Amino acid sequence: KSRHGIVLAKSTLAKQYGIVTGEPLFQARRKCPGLVVVPPNYQLYVRKSDQLIRMLHEYTPLIQQYSIDEAWMDMTGIQEAQADPMGFATGLKDRIHRELGFTVNIGISVNHLLAKMGSELQKPDRVHTLFPEEIPQKMWPLPVDELFFVGKTTAAHLHKLGIHTIGELARTDPRLLEMHLKKHGRAIWKYANGGELDAAVFERRSSKNKGYGNETTLPDDVTDMETACQGILSLCETVGARLRQDNMKISVVGVHVKDNSFTERS
């Protein structure tokens, strides 16, 4: 009956029941009473991530790791990849599955944004191309919230403007988007048209531990300040311990809250 814990990742089958990443486990179990829940094993993820990156370096030194399970490979000048991109990527995908024991999706294109979007087209264990000439057919029909860097809040703003697909976003006057979403509006308009990611995206990922954080899902709704402060104190103690371990100091503290309707405030 406790709602402790959230969904960190879900299988393709669980997704068919409407289970989404970030929702409390008690809600996920309502959607799928027979749900199998496996506790996370972060050290295993780190080890497998390291093995994957080492394998990718066997093919090219130009690797940009975006997260624990995402990386871009620059295959410019790699003759085998240039001659048969789909064949090369399929071979790499199969090798990862065979030697490391997990499946991956690979997207192929001319820039980071399109390769990332290509990798998300259909899962699991797939290879997709998303070249500029394929954008109208493959990317524009997708819901706008599937575009890289369009989160729930931005998607809600776009829906109010009558923008529901990536194609509609691509055809919107960027000045209108800037009026409502500032610089982010023009950035996502560029992405909707297949433009390259901004350099700041990679700069934010280039330095480790620019920020320290911790989060939890409380077992019950909290409506009084004392209980809320106790929860925040517990999180602060964990973050403080990590800061002391790394001999770091901070200048800004932020608190992020999500209520039971998934409305976020910070």
What are these regions (language model features)?
Residues K1-A187, E203, A241:
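Gly/Gly-Pro- and Ser/Thr-rich, intrinsically disordered tail segments characteristic of DNA damage-repair
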